[in-house]
Swiss-Prot record:
NDH shuttles electrons from NAD(P)H:plastoquinone, via FMN and iron-sulfur (Fe-S) centers, to quinones in the photosynthetic chain and possibly in a chloroplast respiratory chain. The immediate electron acceptor for the enzyme in this species is believed to be plastoquinone. Couples the redox reaction to proton translocation, and thus conserves the redox energy in a proton gradient. One of its GO terms (cellular component) is chloroplast thylakoid membrane. It is found in: Plastid, Chloroplast thylakoid membrane. Binds 2 [4Fe-4S] clusters per subunit. GO terms for molecular function: 4 iron, 4 sulfur cluster binding; iron ion binding; NADH dehydrogenase (ubiquinone) activity; quinone binding. NDH is composed of at least 16 different subunits, 5 of which are encoded in the nucleus. Residues 55-84, 95-124 form the 4Fe-4S ferredoxin-type domain. [4Fe-4S] cluster 1 binds at C64, C67, C70, C114. It comes from Nasturtium officinale. It is a peripheral membrane protein. This is NAD(P)H-quinone oxidoreductase subunit I, chloroplastic.
């Protein structure tokens, strides 16, 4: 009779333990119901990038002194800097500046080490194209500032998306 009673007690303990484990899992599932969705519908919704996001490089032609520090610190020697030495004033004059974003690894070394801060990172990250030669940006294309995701009325960002109603 005693083994039968201990068997019932063990069975009851195992049943309670299983119910507790199922309850814990259910509570975790319920705790996730009040969260916002993580997945976004990309072309129509975009995440707002952080301040330190390393997107397309913005170039200010007037600030550049053609020192070529950006070329020396680039791990793949990417920026192409064409300059001409002005003998009468003994300074370099920048003629052309270009970066091929098909090759760029967006490490940010050129921006970090530029002595005149003529390079900066923007929040633009959409470079899709059918021709790889379109990714070679000259100083005119690098000088254009991109439209901010927050200011673009055609894109619904996470900040202005409708919140879930608890109820």
């Amino acid at each position: 009779m005693l083994p039968m009673i201990t068997g019932f007690i063990n069975y009851g303990q195992q049943t309670l333990r299983a119910a507790r484990y199922i309850g814990q899992g259910f509570m975790i599932t319920l705790s996730h119901t009040n969260r916002l969705p993580v997945t976004i519908q990309y072309p129509y919704e975009k995440l707002i990038t952080s301040e330190r996001f390393r997107g397309r490089i913005h170039f200010e032609f007037d600030k550049c002194i053609a020192c070529e520090v950006c070329v020396r610190v680039c791990p793949i020697d990417l920026p192409v800097v064409d300059w001409k030495l002005e003998t009468n004033i003994r300074k370099k004059r920048l003629l052309n500046y270009s970066i091929d974003f098909g090759i760029c690894i967006f490490c940010g070394n050129c921006v970090e080490y530029c002595p005149t801060n003529c390079l900066s990172m923007t929040e633009e990250y959409e470079f899709s194209t059918y021709d790889r030669h379109e990714l070679n940006y000259n100083q005119i294309a690098l000088g254009r500032l991109p439209m901010s995701v927050i200011d673009d009325y055609t894109i619904r960002t996470i900040l202005n998306s409708p919140q879930r109603i608890n109820g």
